[in-house]
Amino acid sequence: MNFHVLTLFPEMIAQGLQTSILGRAVREGCITLDVVNIRDYTENKHKKVDDYPYGGGAGMLIQAQPVYDCYRAAAEKTGGRSRVIYLTPQGKPFHQKMAEEFSREKDLIFLCGHYEGIDERVLEEIVTDYVSIGDYVLTGGELPAMVMIDAIARLVPGVLHNEISADFETFHNDLLEYPQYSRPEEWRGRKVPEVLLSGDHARIGTWRLEQSEARTRKYRPDMFEKYEIRQTCIETMRKKNKLLYMDMIESLRRGRGKLICCSEKGIIIEDEEAKLYMMAAFEASAAEELTACLPAIPENETREFVLHQEYLAEHLEKRFCILESTPFHQAVYTQRTAVPGHPAANLVIRPLDIGYKEEVMRHYHTVQDADYMEERLRSGNIYGAFLDGRLAGFAGVHREGSLGMLEVYEEYRRQGIGAALEASLINLHLSCGYTPYGDIIADNEKSEKLQNKMGLCLSRDTLYWVSAQAGTKPHTPGPAPEE
């Protein structure tokens, strides 16, 4: 990921972001930091970039010309399609979800104001996002830019090294982080809680959750209220049909899903990153009312829907133009114990990088979206099985969290490589505290057989993966009645 910072004080940015974890990430090529001095683009021979504001007032204002020319220089490096973030107290409050959204961009341009601000005309011309880090005034935008870059960069694959840690920290899933302790076991009469010394990971997990809940209830009741609503929805779906609703349960548990609707009649969850809506109507009579809660699809864009009941389809078709509908079953690994590992010592499973894009696209035909597959590779979510150093197959994790993309090359089949790949992904998700699940296209007996072998349970009910766009298909009239 590439960060471009337009500033009058480049040394402040460079010094602040070249140490510790971010400094290492820059050196290892996980992120790049391009700091551009606005003063270098002024047409004033004295390098002046500010002037008095029209209408009077205290202080000086940064002029439009040097900012615009500086922006154009940065935009040329990005292809001119990057989001431009202006740091201002007037902007939207920065939060973790916003950091996650920005982390999916390839390039970000930060514009740092100073003095009394920047000429409004250039802001209207180039800025896409106005962001604030709090209701207070600073001397410039450099510190807010560094705060945002730190929060965003740590979500980029490879930056933290331990990828799991980004998922289990303060603000994850509407909970504050649990208390943590290090050596010695006793300090100034204060002892480490006994449960943390027990080695019982189940007890430790339960204790940490209880501590997170207690802290959130005490310090952030606003967050805890949202957490309780999510937990109520999760418990409702568990009781009704755990296998059928595991994708929705996990979306909420992992902090991905946003509740659009939650009632006794049904639930809608939106995964903004995946541009996906998961829908469950507990009674057929609620399908129309539930579908009406869906927001409109923007023109020329596509949205995906997972329908957990077939009777939702007719109401979805009344609102949107259905492009495709695929029936499938959900396979869920309900155990907490790891699956046995590789069948052969000469088999190595590791993440694939972008260099394997063409090969993956050539062998995997279910998804032919090159941009999607590139994003999955860049984020480290496709794993390859190498037999004696040669790629023999691969599997991956889809954006919304399901396991899939399993493909073993024909010459390597019937050697247990597919099972080894799936076992590796299952164990990875178990280590994150997730419940592994995947989607099996209806009547795919070969895949169903593998899931049974791996110990996964299949939902009896059929789900439907639907692609849709704005508008509805025009009604095709039947034959004219005979006269």
Residue positions per predicted region:
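S-adenosyl-L-methionine/SAH cofactor-binding core of RNA-modifying enzymes
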Residues: Q63-H114
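Structured adenosyl-cofactor binding patch, chiefly the S-adenosyl-L-methionine
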Residues: V122-I164
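N-terminal charged segments
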Residues: E228-H315, M361-T366, A370, E374-E375
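Short amphipathic alpha-helix that is part of the acyltransferase structural core
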Residues: I229-M246, F328, Q335-A370, E482-E483
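Conserved acetyl-CoA-binding loop-helix of GNAT-fold acetyltransferases
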Residues: S285-L294, R414-N427, E448-K449, K453
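Conserved active-site alpha-helix within GNAT-family acetyltransferase domains
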Residues: E310-I322, A442-R460
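Conserved catalytic-core motifs of GNAT/GCN5-like acyltransferases
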Residues: C321-T334, G455-P474
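A conserved beta-strand-loop-helix scaffold within acyl/acetyltransferase catalytic domains
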Residues: D371-E410
